[in-house]
Amino acid sequence: SQFSTPFQFTLLPKKEAANLAAIYTLPEQFICIQHAEELIALPMHCYSDMQTIRAHLYVKKIGMRIGVLKGSDLVPAHDLAMSQWDKMPYETIEVDLNDALQFLRRADFKLNGPKGWHSISYMNCRLGWVKILPNRLNNYYPNTWRILNY
């Protein structure tokens, strides 16, 4: 069963650490660990404690999800957009109320900006991630969180 297998994680291998460092630098006192393909930020002082805890208890989640490295590209996790960290790996685009609501509904809307990943914010509050492509916009807001009626 899922409860018989402890949460497995390792420190990020050097190659992946170099790829991540080229895109994003974690705040001081944080390390990056890897669980399957997912990158997770964990306070340095918690690492050895988490090793002990996971050996004796079922751990469902630890730290804050940063995202997944796909080659030299970081596909950011929604947790990172929701964090209070000042520095993000990609540029933030401020949107108006209508575009913010469209984003939260996962509805189509137009957004001007350079091609690539961006965080979306409304009134300086980050909402999530989009990827601007030449002819469309991919919305990475969690589907289960979307606004259905407003």
Question: Regions from the language model: what does each represent?
Answer:
Residues 1-150:
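Polybasic, low-complexity RNA-engagement segments
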